[in-house]
Design a protein with these regions (language model features):
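Helical scaffold of the NTase/Pol beta-like nucleotidyltransferase catalytic core
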Residues: 1-34
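Conserved aromatic-histidine-acidic binding/catalytic patches
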Residues: 3, 7, 45, 79, ...
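Catalytic metal-binding acidic patch
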Residues: 37-78
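Short loop/turn segments at secondary-structure transitions that flank enzyme active sites
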Residues: 58-61, 98-101, 145, 170-171
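A basic- and aromatic-enriched beta-loop-alpha substructure that forms the phosphate/nucleotide-
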Residues: 65-142
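Conserved nucleotidyltransferase catalytic core and NTase-mimicking acidic/glycine-rich helix/loop elements
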Residues: 123-250
Length: 253
C-alpha cells in the first residue's frame, strides 16, 4: 500500500522541472521547495492536488532598485499543481513576525529542492522567533472559521473535519507549552491526549479520507463534532501565553 501523501517519481520530476523553469523565467534561484496542505500534513486523498511552496532569491541587482518590487511568484493553478513562492527577504520578515504558515513550510516532510546549508541556518532561528501567543491565535482562528464555514449541515464534506481538527490540536499543543506544533498530523495526534472513543473515530475518519475523493460527503460525526465545539468554546477565553520572539534582528540580515 502506497500512502497518498507520498510523491511518486513522475510527479516529483514534474515539480522539479517546474522549479527549473521558474528559475530561468524569473531569473531567480530557488533555495527551498516543499509540499504544504494535505500532503504535507499527511492526510491526502487519492485526488488531492499538490500544493508546492518555495522560497527564492533574486540576483543582487534586484535588491538595489529604489522602487519595491513584487515579492511573490504565483503560477496559474492547473488540475494537479498549485505553485506559489515567496522572495527570501519577505520570508525573513515573516519569520520575524512569527508567521506560523511559514514555520510549517520549513517542517514539511516532502521537500523537492533545498539549499541545505542556508535552510538549516534558517530553521535554527525558529525557536528564537516562535511566538506561542501568535501561533495559538492563528490556529484557533483558522479552526473557528473553518468550523463555521464547512461543518454546519447534517451532511458535511469529510475532509473539512481535518481542517478544523488539525488547527485545534495545534492550538492545544501550543497551550501545553510544547513549542512549535509538528506539521505532520500523525505526530500532532500522537502528542494529543484524547479519549479512546474519540481517537478511534478520528482514526476511522482518517482512513475514509485517505481512501475517498476530496469531494466526499458523509453524515455529521457526533462525537468528533461535540469535541470540536467544546474546544472552540473553551478557546474563546485565550490563555496567557508569551509573545516571545527573542531573536536578534542581525541574525536575519
Amino acid at each position: 500500500f502506497r500512502s497518498n501523501n507520498d510523491v511518486d517519481s513522475a510527479m516529483r520530476a514534474r515539480v522539479c522541472a517546474q522549479l527549473r523553469d521558474i528559475e530561468q523565467r524569473y531569473n531567480v534561484r530557488v533555495l527551498y521547495a516543499c509540499e504544504s496542505g494535505s500532503r504535507g500534513w499527511g492526510f491526502a486523498s487519492p485526488d488531492s492536488d499538490y500544493d508546492v511552496r518555495f522560497l527564492y532569491v533574486h540576483r543582487p541587482e534586484w535588491y538595489l532598485r529604489v522602487e519595491a518590487q513584487r515579492d511573490v511568484i504565483e503560477l496559474p493553478i492547473d488540475d494537479e499543481l498549485d505553485v506559489c513562492g515567496w522572495e527570501w527577504r519577505k520570508a525573513l520578515g515573516l519569520l520575524k513576525g512569527a508567521n506560523p504558515t511559514f514555520i510549517e513550510w520549513l517542517d514539511s516532510p516532502v521537500v523537492y529542492q533545498e539549499d541545505e546549508t542556508v535552510v538549516a541556518e534558517l530553521r535554527a532561528l525558529i525557536p528564537a522567533w516562535f511566538s506561542p501567543l501568535r501561533a495559538r491565535w492563528h490556529y484557533y482562528s483558522m479552526a473557528r472559521k473553518n468550523f463555521r464555514g464547512y461543518l454546519q449541515g447534517e451532511t458535511v464534506r469529510l475532509k473539512k473535519y481535518f481542517y478544523v481538527l488539525r488547527p485545534l490540536l495545534a492550538a492545544r499543543w501550543v497551550e501545553a507549552g510544547k513549542g512549535v506544533p509538528p506539521m505532520r498530523f500523525a505526530e500532532l495526534l500522537a502528542g494529543s491526549e484524547l479519549c479512546a472513543p474519540l481517537r478511534a473515530e478520528i482514526d476511522a475518519l482518517l482512513e475514509i479520507k485517505q481512501r475517498a475523493g476530496e469531494a466526499e460527503y458523509g453524515p455529521k460525526r457526533p462525537l468528533l463534532h461535540a469535541f470540536l465545539q467544546s474546544e472552540l468554546v473553551r478557546g474563546e477565553v485565550p490563555p496567557v501565553l508569551p509573545d516571545s520572539r527573542e531573536g536578534n534582528l542581525k541574525d536575519l540580515d
